[in-house]
Amino acid sequence: MRYGKVKNFAIKLARLPLLVPAALVVTGVRLLGLFGVSVKFSNFFSERIGHLVGNIEIYLCERDLGMHDGIHIWTHYGHISSQQIALMWKRVMRVWPSYFTTLVILINKMFPGWEKNEIGTNTMDRDPKDVLQRCKPHLVFTDDERLRGEATLKELGLGPGDQWVCLMVRDAAYLPTLTYHAYRDCDVDTYADAALMLAERGYHVFRMGKTMAKPFNVKHPRIHDFAMDGTYSDFMGVYLGAYCAFCVSTSTGWDAIPQAFRRPMCYTNFVPFEYIPTWLPNSLVIWKHHLKATLTRVKGKLVDGGWEAYTDSGKGKVQGSFISLEDDELTDQDWKHMSIEEIEDSGAGMFMQEQDFVRAGIKLKDNTPEEILEVVSEMADMIEGKSAPDNQTEFWEKFPRSSSLSEPLHGEIRIRVGAKFLKERYAERKEDSSGSAGARRLEARTA
């Protein structure tokens, strides 16, 4: 702690000589504004690769389409999650050193009207305006970088014309201090069958990630545990995502790389449900199963600070206005699959923290290895031109058009649900004997 304070003081002291130049820049910027020349500043959200790539690619597309005017100057804020991405952005944007630009931004904020000189934090990595399909990718490799990538692929055993699939499975090693996102974690072992299927079809499979909880123990010469075998590099983490045949993911920030290069995506175990990246073409999605506990009676007795509650064959705890359920004391009969309408009505489709699901008495169940294999096989067939997804019109007409912070989450819908997953989810609800309104509505829609 003491070292940190000394370091911060030293940084502030070193910046003192820059105060006058920064103030002169602010003065110049304000004077230019009087003559109709707009100069604006903003920070990259550098610490998260999803925002460093996704937000900025959307911004640059908007700029190309005339949605942003003026001279824009950017700087990094915080630790840079990918030096390769930072280097590539510098080729197409004005990026100033953070130690100086931060002072410019702070001094500018000391005077009225500072908002005119700020781009504002672009926190949207979604594409409801459909800008990605109207613009070319802005991340571009140099000739030397392409040669470097090809040479590395050769070292890894890939020959000319070989295709590969990126596999990105979020686990507990990703942002371990932010446990409220743990509901998004999955077990990479459940992807073994899908990886082997792809390898047998001739694809190389690269398990991606910079820091992962455990190795991907699947033995095949075309399956590479890039995240754990010591071959990972910041550069290849971008290169592989840029040129993959498609990417299989559970939805992480790294996905922004293949998305920015307009690569097809196959999402599995996706949550939150209403945040599905609907704008992606040539892509498929299946989501985690949402299960609702059905409590039939509650005992009016306080137990360890909560009311003891019983289901037909197990028990949980009522704490305040929500139910904390103990999985080891509940059986499968205590859980009921939720329909799309029930997910939407409960608010679970927009839940962003694990505790939200706990409060609502909802448990998320991962996709099975069979479900993952099925949708990845369908994706490979689609990429190879062996099949094409249908429009799924009825489903997408009912899909909730949610908004977040007054911004729409969806525009034109291009992604499709895995065909077998969609069919079986509906069949599952039709066989549900609970008689719920959601089940009846779903049965009517799929009759």
Where are these regions (language model features)?
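Secretory-pathway glycan-assembly enzymes, especially type II membrane glycosyltransferases
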Residues: 3, 11-146, 381, 393-431, ...
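Catalytic donor nucleotide-activated moiety binding site of glycosyltransferases and closely related
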Residues: 167-175, 188-233, 397
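Short, flexible/disordered intra-domain loops and linkers
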Residues: 44-48, 174-184
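Short, well-ordered alpha-helix to beta-strand connector turns
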Residues: 89-96, 202, 243-244, 261
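Short loop/helix-cap segments at secondary-structure boundaries that form the rim of catalytic
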Residues: 84-89, 213-222, 257-259, 277-279
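Short, solvent-exposed loop/turn segments at secondary-structure junctions
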Residues: 79-80, 170-174, 211-214, 253-255, ...
